[in-house]
Amino acid sequence: MKKRIVVALGGNALGNNAEEQRELVRQTAVPIVDLIAEGHELVLAHGNGPQVGMINLAFDNPNVPPMPFPECGAMSQGYIGYHLQNAIREELLQRGLNHPVATIVTQVVVDIEDPAFQNPTKPIGSFYSEEKAKEIAKETGFVMKEDSGRGYR
């Protein structure tokens, strides 16, 4: 029986730079296309925490205006989707399969008064030592939290 399958990829599984990400999504495309070849309909979702942080850091230059987080999120969705779409399309073509692949950039509506903003629970960006995280928090006002034993972000 053919099914609609949702595949979720974590942002941390997508690599730390564009070259690494292209290789990882190329590898990921193989089992995804296996499912498409079996007749299943796939929806892919992905994380982007590290990528949003890397984009934000790229604008950390006094000569360049800062990039707001919503735009960083859209940029990360765009380039991650671009890499996924290309890798899946290439794998489909290699197998002689003509199947459409599309990328959708999403938006989220939030209430700025939501008390959850006072205690963020989803860290993004690069990992830092506790000392460096405290320094960044003091300089920027960002909330820095320990993340899964991997450091602070």
Predicted regions located by residue number:
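N-terminal glycine-/serine-/threonine-rich phosphate-binding loop
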Residues: 1-50, 54-60, 72
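Ligand-binding beta-strand-loop-alpha-helix segment within the catalytic cores
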Residues: 62-153
